[in-house]
Swiss-Prot record:
Record localization: Mitochondrion
Species of the source: Saccharomyces cerevisiae (strain ATCC 204508 / S288c) (Baker's yeast)
Family under the similarity heading: Belongs to the AIM18/AIM46 family.
Keywords associated with the record: Mitochondrion, Transit peptide
Domain of life: Eukaryota
SUPFAM superfamilies in the record: Chalcone isomerase
UniProt keyword annotation of Thylakoid present: no
Phenotypic consequence of gene deletion: Increases frequency of mitochondrial genome loss.
Protein name from the UniProt record: Altered inheritance of mitochondria protein 18, mitochondrial
């Protein structure tokens, strides 16, 4: 392509971009569409030298239009710090699926007790941040006291040497949970060993299947830092997981996979068909490492499947110290 024509093309697009950014209208994408139609496209010879193509214009303009389009679209809950709105019964985790309830009970889900929302976020894959599912992490209402009973001043001075005496025990514990990945893993694992019951609600934002959901769980569990020290025991647990997750077929967007961590460390899997509002208990994994490693990965460490869910959950846990 001729350098002069390329330069003119880019200048025209730059002028269009600048004009739309300065437009009093809040929708820069609409501004771009109006102005781009008035720009006269320049023809460029293709490789055959016999056919003319508009592809350079379309390539550059598509990139520009895409950036303006996504600039105007609201982003839901990607970096929220005010995680839990007051006076509501649910919260939007992703705009493409139903809101998540702040409370889950045995009246509306196949669970053993009442759970309160602890943290939430989205699961992304690849560097393009391709969204896979919305995730809600819940803590059993009757187990909230286990947080302060386990992570207290005695625990702090027993296991950690780098305590800042100018800070309160709660401030020191909060610092370790939020800023030290290795120590946060130890603290969360100790919390889970206390018998703390938890629940994960996974809601796909696009159609998927049970195989992909199971593979995702196995990958998450396998990234726990203590896997190498527990290979044989964990292998048996993953075999149990495969049996409990034996259902095949598709999972529609907005259906739910409910994973409940029971007091004895077992995991119960349930499936919610949101279209027909039907529930199915799929199976139970009794191997305690599977549940412990899964929820530990959700709550801490470098390789959490949803950093936003981890952050909001840890922030909430700190308020319970």
């Amino acid at each position: 392509m001729d350098r002069g024509r390329c330069a003119n093309m880019l200048k025209s697009l730059q002028r269009t971009l600048a004009k739309c950014q300065k437009s009093p209208s809040t929708n820069h994408w609409q501004c771009f569409k109006r102005n781009f139609t008035s720009i006269r496209a320049t023809k460029y010879p293709g490789r055959s030298n016999s056919t003319f193509h508009y592809w350079p214009w379309f390539a550059a303009s598509t990139l520009l239009a895409t950036s303006l389009y996504y600039r105007d679209r609201p982003v839901q809950n990607d970096d929220k710090t005010d995680a839990f709105p007051s006076h509501t019964e649910s919260i939007q985790v992703d705009s493409s699926v139903s809101d998540f309830p702040l409370t889950i009970t045995a009246l509306n889900f196949p669970v053993s007790t009442t759970f309160k929302l602890l943290g939430y976020g989205q699961r992304h894959v690849t560097f393009l941040r391709f969204k896979v599912y919305a995730l809600g992490l819940y803590l059993a209402e009757n187990d909230e006291n286990l947080v302060s009973d386990t992570l207290n001043e005695t625990y702090l001075h027993k296991y950690f040497l780098d305590v800042d005496d100018s800070k309160t025990p709660k401030e020191n514990l909060a610092r370790l949970l939020k800023r030290d990945d290795s120590k946060s893993v130890m603290m969360i694992d100790d919390l889970l060993d206390s018998g703390m019951r938890m629940l994960a609600k996974i809601t796909p934002v696009r159609n998927t299947d049970f195989k992909h959901l199971k593979e995702g769980l196995v990958k998450t569990i396998s990234k726990h830092p203590d896997v190498a020290n527990n290979k044989d025991t964990l292998a048996k647990g993953l075999s149990e997981l495969n049996d409990a997750f034996s259902r095949k077929g598709s999972v529609r967007k907005n259906d739910d996979l409910i994973i409940e961590l029971l007091a004895n460390g077992a995991l119960q899997f349930s499936y919610h068909d949101s279209k027909n509002n039907e529930f199915e208990v799929m199976g139970v994994v009794n191997n305690q490492l599977v549940g412990k490693f899964l929820f530990s990965q959700y709550l801490c460490g470098e390789k959490s499947p949803s950093p936003q869910a981890k952050k909001t959950a840890i922030d909430k846990l700190i308020t319970l110290l």
